[in-house]
């Protein structure tokens, strides 16, 4: 089944059971809808209002206070992120949706599994080796220069360098993820179908036959293999949020020293250790998507604290669009080299 078929075949009883196990029992139900507390964005259930509706005809959620329309896939992402729970898309979202009524919240989350590994090995600055996938899987996909990317500052040379492919059957841009040694440790897909983008997500691991080509994003850096020599020569690394930024940077006039944490606006200790193993590195610059509304400073201090946490190991800094250079959700790379360079000159250095 595709994602739409999965959603269409959801049983209301299974959704109610899942919500109950997540600490959100139904407040009210009639023949058309079930009303739940807004646990989608309230980490504290006591602060939740009774404005999260599940509509039986569409099998979709709608949060009337903040999150708006959501499929069950999107709802789970909101739920985890509101609680700072690190999740694995396949284990904690896809598999949960496929077996709603049997979900055990004490066993289902990926955070204890991955965080314990980072803590165990990160303290001693040791790396563990992620499982490797057969590179032959990439031959399933064709080589193509997707206009969605070539019209957004990504060159043909960048697409070739990072071995970007295209899936005809899934209508997705295929993004191989390699570790620092060039081993294939995951494959992600950038959805092009609008329905899937809105109701499931834009970037997800790829499934071929019965295999999900997934990996813990928190234990790798996209682009590290392709750009490690540039990072070593220039002694600096730009850490972006998404893969697209790494490819956009390939078109700049200076060597590409960019990697991406992929979906996480912050670098963790394990990822920093990957960078610290590159000889001679002197500075790590966080270059994340713009998340601040005018007059706010919460995101500024989030970036500041992330840098401060690791400033004893290496020079840490971050770019921040103070003067409206970026719109909400835009990355520092989206506006091209001139804007990126100007933001870089005015980066915040944290000691």
Q: What spans do the regions from the language model cover?
A:
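Phosphate-handling DNA/RNA-contact segment within nucleic-acid enzymes
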Residues: 46-48, 168-279
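Terminal peptide-recognition signature
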Residues: 38, 63, 76, 149, ...
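Short acidic alpha-helix initiation/capping motifs at coil-to-helix transition points
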Residues: 65-70, 137-143
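N-terminal structured subdomain of primase-like DNA metabolism proteins
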Residues: 1-107, 151, 168-169
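Short, basic/aromatic recognition patches
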Residues: 150-170, 226-229
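Long, compositionally biased
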Residues: 37, 111-125, 176, 181-189
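Conserved active-site segments centered on acidic
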Residues: 87-141
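TOPRIM fold recognition
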Residues: 1-12, 62, 70-73, 234-235, ...
């Amino acid at each position: 089944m595709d994602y739409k078929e999965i959603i269409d075949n959801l049983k209301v009883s299974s959704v109610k059971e899942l919500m109950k196990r997540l600490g959100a029992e139904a407040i009210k139900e009639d023949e058309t809808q079930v009303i739940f507390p807004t646990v989608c964005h309230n980490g504290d259930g006591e602060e939740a209002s009774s404005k999260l509706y599940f509509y039986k005809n569409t099998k979709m959620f709608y949060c009337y206070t903040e999150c708006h329309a959501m499929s069950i896939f999107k709802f789970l992402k909101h739920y985890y992120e509101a609680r700072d729970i690190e999740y694995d898309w396949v284990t904690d979202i896809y598999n949960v949706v496929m077996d709603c009524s049997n979900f055990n919240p004490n066993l289902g989350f990926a955070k204890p599994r991955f965080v314990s590994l980072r803590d165990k090995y990160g303290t001693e600055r040791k790396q563990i080796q992620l499982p490797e996938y057969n590179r032959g899987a990439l031959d399933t996909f064709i080589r193509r220069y997707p206009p969605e990317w070539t019209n957004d500052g990504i060159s043909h040379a960048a697409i070739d360098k990072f071995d970007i492919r295209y899936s005809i059957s899934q209508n997705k841009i295929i993004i191989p993820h390699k570790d620092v040694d060039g081993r294939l440790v995951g494959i992600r897909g950038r959805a092009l179908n609008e329905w899937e983008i809105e109701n499931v997500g834009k970037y997800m691991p790829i499934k071929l036959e019965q295999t999900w080509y997934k990996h813990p994003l928190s234990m790798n850096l996209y682009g590290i293999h392709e750009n490690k020599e540039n990072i070593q020569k220039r002694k600096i690394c730009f850490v972006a949020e998404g893969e697209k930024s790494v490819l956009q940077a390939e078109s700049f006039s200076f060597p590409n020293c960019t990697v991406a944490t992929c979906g996480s606006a912050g670098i963790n200790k394990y990822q920093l250790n990957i960078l610290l193993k590159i000889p001679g590195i002197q500075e790590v610059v966080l270059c994340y998507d713009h998340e601040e509304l005018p007059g706010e400073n919460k995101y500024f201090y989030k970036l500041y604290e992330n840098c401060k946490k690791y400033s004893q190991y290496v020079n840490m800094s971050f770019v921040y669009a103070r003067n409206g250079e970026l719109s909400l959700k835009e990355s520092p790379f989206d506006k091209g080299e001139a804007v990126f360079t100007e933001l870089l000159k005015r980066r915040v250095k944290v000691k």
